Amino acid sequence: MSKYELIPFDQTSLHDARSKWEAIAGEDAFDLEFSGFFEWAEKHLAQVEGDSIALNLHNNDALRTDAIVEVVSSRKGQMSKLLKVIPSPMFWDVNNSRADIVTLYTEVFFNVLTRQGFGSSRTVKLYGRDDEMMSILRSIHSLWSIPNTKAEFEGRFLTFTLN
């Protein structure tokens, strides 16, 4: 089994992630950085056509949620858009966690491409909103070596395609 698995949340697993992340971040930082996103996730536990879903990037080794992922599939099911990846506050120290963050994003891309439930979707895109995100996307692009897939930039989008 892979270290990471992209799985649906249920109320229990989302509540557990919320409790653990709040303990790591502290109450004030959690309220500022994550509270609104967890409230959104509670309303997006099931996949509805044309709407986004909250998914759990579950660390199977440590038995924890390392990131919350927002994905939406196009109405035709040909492409998924990776809208957000919210890493756990345990990765806030970007200077010491950069390799871990690149691994998180790589695992998210791989899992979205190969996970059942996204119809015939075989293309995933992520937008580099700022210079830091573009730097992470460039790192992922340079390290990408998963067979039968292709990673390429389309402007500020990093696009992954399963052949």
Regions found by a protein language model. Give the residues of each.
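Non-catalytic substrate-recognition and accessory regions of acyl/acetyltransferase enzymes
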Residues: 1-96, 115-125, 129, 138-163
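Conserved acetyl-CoA-binding loop-helix of GNAT-fold acetyltransferases
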Residues: 94-114
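Short, well-ordered alpha-helical microsegments
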Residues: 133-134
